[in-house]
Amino acid sequence: MKESLKERIKLWKNLYMNAFENAVNAIPNVEGVLLAYNTNIDVIKYLNKDDLERRINQIGKERVFEVIKAPTERISSLEHLFGGILRSIKLGKAIEWFVENEEIRRYLREWGWDELRIGGQAGIMANLIGGVYRIPTIVHVPQNPKLQADLFVDGPIYVPIFEGKELKLVHPKEAVKEENELIHYIYEFPRGFQVFDIQAPRENRFIANADDYNARVYMRKEFKESFEKIAKGVELAIISGLQVLKEYYSDGTTYRDVLDRVESHLNILNRYGVRSHFEFAYTPNRLVREELIGILSKFTSVGLNEVELASIVEIIGDETLAKEVLEGHVFPIIDAINLLMDETGIDRIHLHTYGYYLALTKYRSEEVRDALLFASLAAAAKAMKGNIEKIDHVKDALSVPTNERAIVFEEELEKEFTEFENGLIDMVDRQLAFVPTKIVTSPKSTVGIGDTISSSAFVSEFAMRKS
C-alpha cells in the first residue's frame, strides 16, 4: 500500500475541499436546466412503534403479517398498507405501492403527517437546482394546486403557462390552479427501528402512492405544444419518472404512446445541443425496462444505483454478471457499466451506491471526479438536514467523515489499474472516476437523496467543464 489510511483520508479531504470550491464557483455559469416529468407532494411521517402496533392490532395482526410473506404490490385494504410498511421495515428496503381506492386515501390523510415537501424527482431537483444552486430551472408539473405550489422555494424556478396564445415562464406560486393534489405518503424508519419482532437492518421508507397523474406520466398541454420553445432556453435537461409506465392502460393507450412523446422531446433537445441526463429508477415491468434501455442512446448521461444496474444487465443478457453486481463488489459493477456503455453508446454513466460513486465517461476530465465529490457533499447535507436550504448546508457536509471502507476498494483498484491517480483511472478509450462518499450514520431522511446525488453531479460537472 502506497499510503497509510490516515494519509489517504487526508488526500480525499483536500480533494473534497477543492471540489466544493470549484463547483460553487462554476455553477453560476449554467444558463438553464429543464426538469421533467414527475412532480408531486411528499407527505412524510416518521413511524412510531406504539402507534403502528396499535393500528395493526386493530385490524388484525395475522392478516397483516400474511402480506409480508405474500406482497400484493398494491394497496386496496388496510392489511395491504400495513403489510407493505412491515415488509419494508423487515427488508430495510424502499418499497412503493399504489393506493387503489378512495377509502384508503382518506385513511392516509386522517393518519396525518410530520412534514410536507415537494416530491417527485423533477420537483425535488427543482428546489435544489433553482432554489439552492440558483440556476434558472424550468420544471414540469402535471398538476399545480396551491398545496403543491407553496412547497416550491423562492428562486429562479419556472413553469410554462399560456397567456392567450403566448407562452410565459412564471414561478409555480404564480400559476396555481384548482387541480388535483398528487400525494405520495412516505413512512420513514431509522436503522434498528423495531415493531413487534421485526427490526429494520437499515434506514429506509415505504411509499403509499396516491397519485393518478404521475403514474401515467401525464404531460401538460404547454409541454406537448411548446416543448421546442422551452428547450431553446436551457443548456441541460434531466428526465425522470418513466419507471412507473405500464404496458397497457384502461383507456386503450400504452407505454409506447408516452415513450414516443419522450423520444420526440429528446430529438428536439439533441437538435439544440442540450445535454440530457436520464435518472433511471427501478422499473418493474420488464418490457418497459427493455424499451427504456433502447432509448438511452438518445441521452448524454444516465444515473442509477446497483439494483437498477443489475436489472439492466439482466435485460442485456448477462444474468451471472447481474447477480454479481447485486453482491456489491466493485469489479463486477465496473464490468457492468462498461457493458452498458458498449450496448448504448451513451457518453456518461454515473453509478451511486452506499459508500462510493463511480462515473464512466468517454472523455477525460478531473471535473468528473470533482462533480462526484460535490454530489457526495450535497447528499450528506440532504441526509443531515432532511432538506437543503442554502449552499452553506452543502459546505457543512465537509465535516462529515469520509467512508473508510471504500478505501479498501480504492486499494484494489490501484492494484488492478496501473493508470490510477486521485480517483481517476485511464481505461484507454474511457475514463473511470471513483470517489469514497461521506456517510451520515443517522440520516434525518432518505427521500430524494439519489435525485440530489445525480442532479448535483450532472449539473456541476457541466458547469466546471464549461468554465
Swiss-Prot record:
Keyword set includes Kinase: yes
Residues at which Mg(2+) binds: E279, E308, D451
Cofactor binding description: Binds 1 Mg(2+) ion per subunit.
Name of the top EC class for this enzyme: transferase
E.C. designation(s): 2.7.1.-, 2.7.1.147
BP term (GO), one: glycolytic process
Name recorded for this polypeptide: ADP-dependent glucose/glucosamine kinase
